[in-house]
Amino acid sequence: MPYRKHREKKYEAKYREAFKVFQEEIGITFTDEKLLIQAFTHSSYVNEHRKKPHEDNERLEFLGDAVLELTVSQYLFQKYPTMSEGELTKLRAAIVCEPSLVRFANEMSFGSLVLLGKGEEMTGGRERPALLADVFEAFIGALYLDQGLETVWGYLKEVVYPKINEGAFSHVMDYKSQLQELIQRDGSGNVEYQILQEKGPAHNREFVSRVTLNNEALGLGSGKSKKEAEQQAAAEALKKLKEQS
């Protein structure tokens, strides 16, 4: 057997074993293992192995992107029933953006499984953020095709959703949403807003709002609209709670 073919067979056996271990670690066994391998196959690897029936992960990445958007949207819709469309969109964008996907991929050691061409390997492709984000999306796409939406949901429940619950994306929320999330996380009770005062002429109104937690005042705020006053009250409440913790 020529040396090159022998080396390729050894490499193939090595990565198949790696994918077997990976499936054991995540507790999911693919019905079609080719889909799993394709999710981790970069175009540079396919270009160097043209005689073999390899497919790269770009189409799976396209599908995974849509599946991620849907599942994360559904989770946020259910978790934050009072959050506005604009805030939900902003929060979802923070969760599915490249740096977040890279973080998820790194925590699962996806980089070590990627099949790369030699040139891409030599230029540090395995650590390249865009590549890792693409692989995470492709994996979600492959998981969806092989196991369906329920398994994808279960996987994200282990890998992504806990980080939302821990407040990893709170910085992109408005003050009211941040406060609501903090209270939900701590299981402290119910937050309520009251408009205490409206003053000034119609063209220049000022509103004063109070936010309470279990009927205890947490913060006061004022603004040119009820919404602005409530946001300022929530900001004061957040500051107070952070000082106490």
Swiss-Prot record:
Recorded catalytic activity of this chain's protein: Endonucleolytic cleavage to 5'-phosphomonoester
Enzyme active site: 65, 137
Cofactor entry: Mg(2+)
Domain RNase III: 19-148
Keywords tagged on the record: Cytoplasm, Endonuclease, Hydrolase, Magnesium, Metal-binding, mRNA processing, Nuclease, RNA-binding, rRNA processing, rRNA-binding, tRNA processing
Ranges in a coiled coil: none
Enzyme class: hydrolase
Keyword Repeat tagged: no
EC number from the UniProt entry: 3.1.26.3
Start and end residues of each stretch annotated as Disordered: 218-245
Residues where Mg(2+) binds: 61, 134, 137
GO molecular function: double-stranded RNA binding; metal ion binding; ribonuclease III activity; rRNA binding
Gene Ontology BP term (one): regulation of gene expression
GO cellular component, one term: cytoplasm
Claim: tRNA processing is one of the keywords in the record: yes
Family, similarity comment: Belongs to the ribonuclease III family.
Name the record gives this protein: Ribonuclease 3
